[in-house]
Structure formats: C-alpha cells, structure tokens
C-alpha cells in the first residue's frame, strides 16, 4: 500500500522524501516497482485514470457513489468498493457543503402565506412546484447577491438573477426569468421564505398575474425550504464564494448554473442524473 502511494505521487513529490516519511526504503520501492504488474494492477491503473477523469470533470465534487454511477454510465464495470479504494489511494475526496445560513429577513408588517408545500419536496412532474431563495457571494468589490428559482421535480435552476444590492427587484428578476422561459399552468406552487423581497407588492403582483399558488416557510425555519438551501450550500462548495470582482462572479455563476449544474451534474435525489436529463426523460415518457 505504501509503495502504491509513492508510485502514484512520484511526479509530485521526491521519492526519497516519501520513503522517509512512510518509513520504507527507497531500494525496496525500486525493487517493487521493477516487478511486472499483475493483471489486477493493470486494471486498477486504467480504472484510476477513468476515476480521476470523472472526479476532475465534477469539479472535485463527486464522492464514491456519483463516481461509480458515472463510470457505469460510461460502460466501465467495477464495484463501488473498488472505486472507493482507488479514490482513497489517490487521495480523492469530494468537497463538503457547509451549514445553511439565512439571508433574507421577514417583513413583519407585510402579509404572508401558509406553508402549502409543507416540506413535500418530491413531485411527479416539472412545473408542479418551484422554490426560491437568495444568497450572497463575496467579491473584492463587495457582495454579489444571487436569487434563484428551482424546479422541485428536476432540481433545475429555472430562473436566476444577480445584483450588488439586496432589493425586491432581484427576486422579481429571477422569477420573471423563470416565467419567461417556462410554460406554466395555474396549478404551480411557488414556495419561498417570508423575506421582504418575497412579500413585496411587486413580487406578489407577479405571482397573482400568473395565478400561482403562494406558499411560504414558517418564520425562521430554513428546513421548510431545505432544497434551495441545500443548492446554495452545494454551489458555494463547488464554485467557491470569493471572487476578484462582481463581473467574474457573475460569469462563474453562469458557467456553473447553465453549463454544469443544469446540464451535467448528477443529483442523488433524482436517481443520479442531471436536471436536464430528468426533464428529457419525463418528456419522452409523456410522449410515448
């Protein structure tokens, strides 16, 4: 195991230093290295290359289950325990999301709505339930605020907007974008927290104009909107939350949301497929 680690890292660190740290002899390592590799070792080396390819493509965010699923989708047959072992040997560890942190603040003088969604985060079709919220990213020029609207069926980001200020128009822009790009009926449930951006007159008028069913979390209860909170935690781990400028942060968000997350990133809650694939499968089944 120690010699295997040295072999995998010999281009990154001096062999003699690693041998000293691991308390093995350099001569022993070179004798081990000179032996012909077994068929199993050859297979492990080829599989490790594929694993590293999947891991890099995921922005170093996939753990063993997602890596194993992606390998299977590529037609590579291997067991999950083997993937876990090779990832451990290569030091491949998925980034971990942090705890939720509340961004919006309730406006006590404005009317709110009941919690119609009531933590039912699994629905049977796209455009059945949307969830929205706001978070922020730090830049050297100041905060950049991000508002999103997610579809609960596919977990797709159907609308998003950014602003250097936390205003009512930010949330309004994200919802307007979602409504422009999606064809929705009057049976759509739209769920947010009780933040002032969501209880504002302009936002409520937009909901009313499209006859959406309004649902709001209980005051101060982030778990009532856990799906979008989880998305923000994932985004900040996979994308980062510190940028040189607001413009660069916005560009990074576009690439992450529109190119990676919506189209490629596997989501465990929808069977380890991407949001785009989840909706494509639904459309194909509906047309059959």
Explain the meaning of each model-derived region.
Residues 1-288:
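Charged DNA-binding/catalytic regions of mobile-element recombinases
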């Amino acid at each position: 195991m120690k010699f295997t680690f040295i072999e995998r890292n010999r281009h990154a660190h001096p062999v003699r230093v690693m041998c000293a740290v691991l308390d093995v002899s350099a001569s022993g390592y070179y004798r081990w290295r000179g032996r012909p590799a077994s068929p199993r070792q050859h297979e492990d080396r080829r599989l490790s290359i594929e694993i590293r390819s999947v891991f890099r493509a995921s922005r170093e965010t996939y753990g063993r289950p997602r890596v194993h699923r992606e390998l299977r989708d590529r037609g590579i047959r291997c067991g999950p325990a083997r993937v876990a072992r090779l990832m451990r040997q290569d030091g491949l560890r998925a980034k971990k999301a942090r705890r939720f942190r509340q961004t919006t603040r309730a406006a006590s003088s404005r009317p709110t709505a009941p919690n119609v969604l009531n933590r039912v985060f699994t629905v049977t079709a796209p455009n059945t339930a949307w969830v929205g919220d706001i978070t922020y990213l730090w830049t050297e020029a100041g905060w950049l605020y991000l508002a999103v609207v997610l579809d609960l069926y596919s977990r797709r980001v159907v609308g998003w907007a950014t602003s250097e200020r936390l205003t009512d128009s930010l949330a309004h822009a994200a919802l307007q974008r979602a409504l422009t790009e999606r064809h929705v009926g009057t049976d759509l449930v739209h769920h947010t927290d009780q933040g002032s951006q969501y209880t504002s007159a302009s936002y409520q008028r937009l909901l009313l104009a499209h006859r959406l069913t309004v649902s709001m979390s209980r005051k101060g209860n982030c778990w009532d909107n856990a799906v979008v909170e989880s998305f923000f935690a994932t985004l900040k781990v996979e994308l980062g939350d510190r940028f040189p400028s607001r413009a660069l942060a916005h560009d990074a968000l576009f690439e992450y949301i529109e190119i990676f997350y919506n189209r490629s990133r596997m989501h465990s809650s929808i069977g380890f497929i991407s949001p785009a694939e989840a909706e494509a499968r639904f459309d194909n089944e509906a047309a059959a």
